[in-house]
Amino acid sequence: MSQSYDRGLVEDFGRWQEFSAGMWAWIFHKFTGWVLIGYLFTHVAVLSTATVDAATYTQTLQGLESLLVVRFLEVGLLAVAVFHILNGIRLLFVDLGVGLEAQDKAFYAALIVTAAITVASIPTFLMGAF
């Protein structure tokens, strides 16, 4: 006979406000990792049109680049990739024992650098879209 696990109050949704920077770094790293995996499948699907012929591949790329939403998704992809890389480097240093006392600061620095790179790249990605 098994007993069910008592998880306590399910409606205790306010716990996320108590998360530390390390928990947010873990959540964002997992989320960005899944987004990058999803992008990888999409990227392979688009590249597979090149196996048909060059004209189909060119037509697919031109069709995607003409959509404004794709331009914004590219900016989001850059933000996801930059954060994932910077947080991965932060985790590498933490695993090596470097900067253990400054983990929170390193996480916030990764967020700030990601935001700066993303904002600086917006004109490049949206050039010619309007």
Swiss-Prot record:
Protein's UniProt keywords contain RNA-binding: no
Pfam families named among the record's database cross-references: Sdh_cyt (PF01127)
GO-annotated cellular components: plasma membrane
Domain of life: Archaea
Coiled coil: none
Main location: membrane
Segments in the Extracellular topological domain: 47-71
GO molecular function: electron transfer activity; metal ion binding
Record-listed heme binding positions: H84
Cytoplasmic side of membrane: 1-25, 94-103
Pathway: Carbohydrate metabolism; tricarboxylic acid cycle
Gene Ontology biological-process annotations: tricarboxylic acid cycle
Gene3D superfamilies attached to this UniProt entry: Fumarate reductase/succinate dehydrogenase, transmembrane subunit
Membrane topology recorded in Swiss-Prot or TrEMBL: Multi-pass membrane protein
Record-annotated membrane-spanning stretches: 26-46, 72-93, 104-128
Subunit structure: Part of an enzyme complex containing four subunits: a flavoprotein, an iron-sulfur protein, plus two membrane-anchoring proteins, SdhC and SdhD.
Cross-referenced PANTHER family: SUCCINATE DEHYDROGENASE 2 MEMBRANE SUBUNIT SDHC, SUCCINATE DEHYDROGENASE HYDROPHOBIC MEMBRANE ANCHOR SUBUNIT
Job description of the protein: Membrane-anchoring subunit of succinate dehydrogenase (SDH).
Protein name: Succinate dehydrogenase hydrophobic membrane anchor subunit
Gene of this entry: sdhD
